[in-house]
Amino acid sequence: MTTSTNRITIEQVKSPIGRPGSQKATLIGLGLNKIGRRSSLEDSPAVRGMIAKVAHLIRVIDGQ
């Protein structure tokens, strides 16, 4: 396991209302549950995949 110190900060900008349950669960997995909330996570392939799944509901603040 690598110990990466790279972090990525994301913010929820849209509501998951009317979206599939899997997208709501992904937002919760990312630590987001209300519009305007921010979460700072370790930059890993798993997190990048989750971000890609709900990219239309969030905004990446810090990171690539």
From Swiss-Prot:
One of its GO terms (cellular component) is cytosolic large ribosomal subunit. The keyword Ribosomal protein applies. GO terms for molecular function: structural constituent of ribosome. Gene3D superfamilies: Ribosomal protein L30, ferredoxin-like fold domain. InterPro entries: Ribo_uL30_ferredoxin-like_sf, Ribosomal_uL30_bac-type, Ribosomal_uL30_ferredoxin-like. It holds the Pfam family Ribosomal_L30. It comes from the Bacteria. Keywords: Ribonucleoprotein, Ribosomal protein. One of its GO terms (biological process) is translation. The keyword Acyltransferase does not apply. Part of the 50S ribosomal subunit. PANTHER family: LARGE RIBOSOMAL SUBUNIT PROTEIN UL30M, MITOCHONDRIAL RIBOSOMAL PROTEIN L30. Belongs to the universal ribosomal protein uL30 family. HAMAP family: Ribosomal_uL30_B (MF_01371_B). This is Large ribosomal subunit protein uL30. It comes from Beijerinckia indica subsp. indica (strain ATCC 9039 / DSM 1715 / NCIMB 8712). The lineage of its organism: Bacteria, Pseudomonadati, Pseudomonadota, Alphaproteobacteria, Hyphomicrobiales. The gene is rpmD.
